[in-house]
């Protein structure tokens, strides 16, 4: 269904190489996504080219910023229908991936897809602000998120999961640089430090701003706060 050569070409352009098995898995995942989307609202993007560019290639841009090795613990916070988590797992099946979301129906699809692809992952049904205060706190080498929350809000949800010395990769759109400017204080409060930023253009003209936040100190125990408080009074 999807154009595997297009996916391979796009990813090679940002120095991410996919082997034959990965490309076969992407084709199967695309089929699963389109089929399940008929009964469950996973995505508005269902055309083959859109899936390749806006879901698969876009998710894999994170590998420009982070380089997880075998056994590294990675968490995708707010994975939804499995993005960027499943594409990252297809490209790097040796990582220990956790995909977290608060919507059970979407996670059922994520679980079904991981099983069908012959991969392994830890699927967690929980709210990020609650999971980030429990046993998952500061246990991950990398956190990634494509969630739509503002950067300062996203950092409060994600940085508590990252161990000191680890990295949070925020996958933002065209306003990522502006959002980062408004989030620097929050990043510092949460124990982070901006490490690097890169902007990429996808073939459809979409802009992806990738921001790496290095965890340099423990997150204070009062964070993350309850979601209502995060929304009402974001760190700034």
Residue spans for each PLM region:
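Helix-to-beta-strand junctions that scaffold the AdoMet/dcAdoMet cofactor pocket
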Residues: 92, 162-164
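Class I SAM-dependent transferase core
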Residues: 2-75, 105-120, 125, 226-228
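Conserved beta-strand signature within the Rossmann-like core of class I S-adenosyl-L-methionine
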Residues: 165-175
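Short "lid" loop at the C-terminus of a central beta-strand within the Rossmann-like core
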Residues: 129, 150, 173-177, 201
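Residue-level signal for inorganic ion chemistry
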Residues: 33, 88, 110, 172, ...
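Short alpha-helix immediately C-terminal to the canonical SAM-binding loop
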Residues: 106-108, 176, 180
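Conserved SAM/SAH cofactor-binding pocket of Class I
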Residues: 60-149, 155-156
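SAM/dcSAM-binding transferase cores
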Residues: 181-236
